Amino acid sequence: MNEEYLNYCQKAYQKILAANNILIVSHLHPDVDALSSVGIMIELAESLDKKYLAYASDKDEKIFDFLPHSERIHSKLPIGFSFNDYDLVIVLDCGAINRTGLAEALHNRNKKKIYVVEFDHHPPVDHFADIEIRVPHLASATEVLYHFLKVNNITINKNLSSLLLSGILTDTGNFLYPSTSDETINIASEMLRSGAQLPKIFQNTLQNKNLASMKLWGLALKNLKLNSKYDLAVSVLTKEEIAEVKNEVGFDEASSDVFGDIIGLLGNLGGMKGVILFREELDGRVKASLRTSDPEIDISRLASLFGGGGHPKASGLLTHGKIIQKNDGWEFEY
């Protein structure tokens, strides 16, 4: 982190110390990195005896209950909630304001009374925060928060170490994704020495796949095609295939991280410069996840051609179109 971000981290901590009532927010359908980040802020708020509310819209109440403080995170805003009751809002792992579920309140807030601090590792989409601590080259939001804790000399206890390691492990695909750096590994090692429970994290993430995940993995592997011209591996999941799995075994497509798991699995294919997973949405749009481990390729440039974006090694897009099966593979019409 450069000096500017060090100053931002110090200023953000001063705002936390001065706050009377803190609203801690992450993105809708939160993943492990998002909930771990919220848990870190809960741990900090409670250690400072601060009044707070933690909120992540449509949080899965079962899958992530192994995380410290997960039971304190509201999946729906409580009855009687008023945004104006809070003088500090902390937004975590959520660059797009509409994914907080509080976009209107954040946009229309009284900036003299309500201060907003954002911690994120995604490329910027909206600039809505008063302090924006955004470090896109870091592997996870929890890695950003690790530096925040260190800058402010906050002791990393057992709860914090487990939360930090959980976010790092899941957002790096257990250190397989290109975003993993030497520093990421060193931080993870430090968290183990600080008391993080690695077997418990593995059991509840890597070894906790459901039947729907396995069936969708199978379909993605069955549909996998190789493009020898561009050294790309491409797979698709049609809306009919997704609907069939949902009808057979049931799963919440929006809250499931299965699609992220699939693109991570496809990324293990050797000899390819990149992988793309297309999936059809019910509303006629197509989502795509793009990954590369080639040091010479910025996959976000390809995503940007279709209105998407992201990191150089991991990007996504959402556009209107359809997937058409051909004899020799798939075509994407938009």
Tell me what each language-model feature is.
Residues 2-28, 34-68, 80-88, 170-334:
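Hydrophobic helix-and-loop "lid/oligomerization" segment in the mid-to-C-terminal part
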Residues 34-35, 99-103, 128, 287:
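Short glycine-/acidic-enriched loop or helix-start segments at secondary-structure transitions
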